[in-house]
């Protein structure tokens, strides 16, 4: 039997979901900065680590943004990415994963971080609005099996790195 616990603000702007092997912290607060979100995450993680006897064995920061556009603009983006002319797919997706190594200031501990980017064309409201969009999903995470001691040692650097990676991707893909 799998148990889960979900905590949330009444307005749903902050949710903490506990599953059998993870805790997800999700914010949908409009206009929130990464720094504010990170401060909230730090507080929640500190409360959890103080009150629960579990070590953090993996970190991840995810973000999504939809760029609304007409079908012609969506096809222009596809043509640039696929380098194929005169092709009109009804659905397309591009995914890439880059890796970064984060090391403590003294160089004694390090972790490998995946920077995952996925672009997908999408119809924003199927059946109602035929306007297209491009969905950018980003997932910055540590590798499964990384030492909990190493994760703890680079946790601050991870959050700074992950929020910077996502900010840079949002700016890059807007253009």
Model regions and ranges:
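Short, low-complexity cationic-aromatic patches
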Residues: 14-16, 32, 127
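Short, flexible beta-strand-to-coil junctions
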Residues: 8-10, 28-30, 139-145
């Amino acid at each position: 039997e799998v148990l889960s616990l979900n905590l949330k603000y009444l307005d749903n702007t902050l949710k903490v979901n506990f599953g059998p092997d993870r805790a997800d912290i999700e914010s949908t607060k409009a206009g929130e900065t990464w720094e504010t979100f990170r401060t909230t995450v730090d507080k929640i993680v500190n409360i959890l680590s103080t009150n629960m006897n579990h070590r953090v064995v993996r970190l991840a920061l995810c973000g999504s943004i939809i760029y609304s556009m007409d079908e012609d603009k969506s096809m222009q983006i596809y043509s640039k990415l696929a380098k194929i002319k005169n092709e009109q797919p009804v659905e397309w997706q591009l995914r890439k994963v880059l890796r970064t190594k984060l090391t403590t200031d003294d160089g004694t501990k390090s972790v490998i971080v995946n920077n995952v980017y996925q672009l997908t064309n999408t119809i924003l409201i199927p059946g109602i609005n035929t306007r297209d969009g491009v969905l950018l999903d980003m997932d910055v995470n540590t590798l499964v099996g990384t030492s909990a001691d190493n994760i703890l040692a680079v946790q601050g650097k991870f959050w700074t790195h992950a929020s910077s990676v996502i900010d840079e991707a949002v700016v890059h893909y807007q253009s």
